[in-house]
Amino acid sequence: MDYLEKLQSLMENHPSDFFSLWEEYCFNDVVSGDELIVLLEKIKSSSIAPAFGKIAESVIPLWEQLPESEEKDKVLSLVFDIQTTNSKRLLELALQQVKKYEDSPNYKEALRIVGLRDGIFFTHCLRHFALLMHLCEGNFVFHQGGWGVGEIMGVSFLQQKVLVEFEGVLTAKDISFETAFRMLSPLKKDHFLARRFGDPDAFEAFARKDPVAVIECLLKDLGPKNAKEIRNELVGLVIPEEDWSRWWQSAKIKMKKDSHILAPTSSKDPYIFDPKGFSFISQLQASLSGSNDASKKIASCYTFVRDLGSELKDEANRQFVIKELKSLDLPADSALSIQRAMLLSEFLGDKSSELDCENIAKLSEDQMFDIVNHIEILSFQKSFLSLIHSCSPAWVSVFTKILLTTSTSILRDQVFKALIVDKKARESILEKVSAMIEQPLLYPELFVWLFLRVVSGEDGLFSESDRKEIGRQMLASALEFMHKVAGSPQKDLGKKLYSFLVGQRFLAIRQIIENASIDYLKEFVLLSSKCPQFTQGDLGVLRSLAEVVQPALKRRVAEEENILWTTSESFTRMKAKLQSLIGKEMVDNAKEIEDARALGDLRENSEYKFALERRARLQEEIRVLSEEINRAKILTKDAVFTNSVGVGCKVVLEDEQGEEDCYTILGPWDANPEEKILSLKSKLAQEMVGKTVGESVLFQGKKHKIKQISSIWD
C-alpha cells in the first residue's frame, strides 16, 4: 500500500496515526502533484480539516518541489482553503501568488475583499481571488446548486455583485460575491461546458468535423464517462437525436486509433482520457497479462491487429503478437485453434498447416458444424465457411444445417448464396420452402429471413412469374405466423414482420396483393384481423388496399363500420350529457370569459386565458359527442346474432386449465372492464369477433377456447 492509500485509510478512523504518517510523507524526495491534490481534497472535506489547518504550512516545502504548472497552482490554492493560521509567511506567499493579476483594474479591491489587504483572515483567498479576476463580461461559470453553466453579463465591484445568465434559469440572476464564492466555479472558454453553452452551433459543427476531439474535451473536463453518460452530455445539446447513432458509431471507430482515450471493456465501464497518451502495444500487453482465458486473448489480439494494423509495421510488435498467440495451449481442430491459425495467417503472415485443404477435408460434418458455431469472431466464421466450401465434400450438408439453424443473417446469406448455385442443394431448399409455407414455425428465423428476400426479389430461387404466387403464399403464412408468435418468446420475429409489412406505406403488401383474386383477398383480410401487431388503423388500411384491388370487397352498406352501437340507457345518458354541455357548461363558461375580461389587460390575464382554454375544450367535447350521437344505433334483440361472436353477445372463454370467464361485448359507451363488459373496438373483442364456438383466441399470452355464445337478452 502506498502513502496515498495509507493516509486515506487513516484519515477518518485513526487521526493520530495519520499525522504521524504525514510527517514522514513530508520528507519525500519525489513529489507527485496529482497525488498531493487528491490528498488535500480528501483532507478538505474530512473531519480532520480543522486540525490539519494548523499545520497546512507543512505542505509548502512539497509544493516548492513541483514544476510550474496549473497543478502547482491548484495545490497552493487547496493549502489556503484548508489553512487556519493566517501566518505572515502564508500572507507573503499569497500576495506573491496574486501579483500576476496586478494589472487588473479591480486588483486592489479584490485584495480587500479576500482579506489580503489587512492580512488578518485570508482562508480561501487564492480560490476567491482567482474567481474575482475571472468575473468579466463574456466569461463562463458553473453553478454548484443546479443552475448549470452561466455566462457573465455584468459585474460590479462597488456593489459586490455579478449578473449571470444560466442555462437552467429563464432570467439573468444577480449574485453577490459572497454567494459566488460558495456556488460558482470559473470555466475557461475552451471548457466543454462553456463551449456547449456559449456557442452551440459552432460546437456542433466542430463535433461533426472532429468527433474524437469533442469526446477528448468532454472526458478531460468532466472526467471518465461511460457510453450512456456521454450520450446524455451530447445528444440534443450538441448532436441532434436523429443523427446520434450514426455520429456515435463513427466516433467509436475513430476513438480506437486515439492514444489519449482508453476504451472500456464493457458498456457500463467508462471511457478515460489520458493527457499523456498511452502505447497501444502496452495496452495489449496489459490485457493479455490480466487474463488466463484463451478466447479473450485471441479476441484482444484480433481487435489489435484489425483496428491498429499500422502498429504491426514495428517488427517487435508483430513478433510479440505472434509469440503470444503461439504460446496458447489449445486443443487441435478446435474453434479456438482455427481462430488462432486464421489470425496468424490472415493478419500476421504466419501460415499454419491447420488451414490446409487436406486437414479441412478430414474433418467430419459434425466437427465442421461445431467449429463454425463456436468461432466467436464473425469474419473468421466466414473464412472458415469458405474453406469448407472449397475443401470439404460434405459442404452441402454443413451449409444446409447452418442455413436452418443460424441466427446470424450474414452467415445465412453466405451459405444460402453458395447452396442455390448447386442443383441438388437448390432442390432441397425449395422443398424446405414448401414445408415452411405449410408450417412457418418449423424454422421461424429462416422463414422470416426468406420471406423478406422473396418479397424484395433478392431470393435468387424463383422466376419473376413464380415469385408473385410464392410471395402470396408466404404472406398468408406470415400473417398466420404473426398471430401464433404474438405471446411467445419469438414475438420479436412477429414485430420484424410487422415493421416490414407496414413500411414504406405498406409497399410490400401492395406489391404482393396486386391482381390477387377476391378469394385470396378475403383470406388476407381475415388473417390480418387476427394479428395483434396490427392496429385498428392498420387494419383499415389493409382492407382499403384489398378493396382497391377488388372493389367487390366493399361492404354493401358503407356506413356499417361507422356505427356506434349503444344500449338505450347509454344513448339517453349521452344525449343528456350533450344537453348539459350546451345548455349549462357553455353558458357558465361564457360568463367566466366576461368576468375575466373585466379584470383588465388581457395579455397578463391568466383567468381570461384559462376561460378561453376551457371554452375550446368544451367546444371540442360537444363536437365529438354530437358526431358520436349521430352515428349511434340502439342495440335491439333483433340485431344480435349468436352463430358467431359479435356486438350484443355474451362469450364464455375457457383456458387450458379449464377455468371459465364470461365477457359481454357492447359499444364503447357501455364498456366496463371491471364487470367484464368489453368495447366492440377493444383488442380482445376484435380477437373474438367473427369466431364461433370451439375456436381459440389468444388472451394475456394464453390460449382460450370459445365455449359458449349467447345474447345479452337470453
Swiss-Prot record:
Lineage top rank: taxon: Bacteria
Ranges for region GREA: 561-714
One of the GO BP terms on file: DNA-templated transcription elongation
UniProt keywords, alphabetically: Coiled coil, DNA-binding, Transcription, Transcription regulation
Any one GO molecular function term: DNA binding
PROSITE patterns the UniProt entry points to: GREAB_1, GREAB_2
The keyword Transcription appears for this protein: yes
Keyword Endoplasmic reticulum applies: no
Domain GRAD1: 1-502
InterPro entries xref list: GreA/GreB_C_sf, TF_GreA/GreB_CS, Tscrpt_elong_fac_GreA/B, Tscrpt_elong_fac_GreA/B_C, Tscrpt_elong_fac_GreA/B_fam, Tscrpt_elong_fac_GreA/B_N, Tscrpt_elong_fac_GreA/B_N_sf
Pfam families tied to this protein: GreA_GreB, GreA_GreB_N
Coiled-coil regions, chain positions: 602-639
Function: Necessary for efficient RNA polymerase transcription elongation past template-encoded arresting sites. The arresting sites in DNA have the property of trapping a certain fraction of elongating RNA polymerases that pass through, resulting in locked ternary complexes. Cleavage of the nascent transcript by cleavage factors such as GreA or GreB allows the resumption of elongation from the new 3'terminus. GreA releases sequences of 2 to 3 nucleotides.
Family: Belongs to the GreA/GreB family.
PANTHER family linked to this entry: TRANSCRIPTION ELONGATION FACTOR GREA
HAMAP family assigned: GreA_GreB
Descriptive protein name: Transcription elongation factor GreA
Naturally occurring in which organism (per UniProt): Chlamydia muridarum (strain MoPn / Nigg)
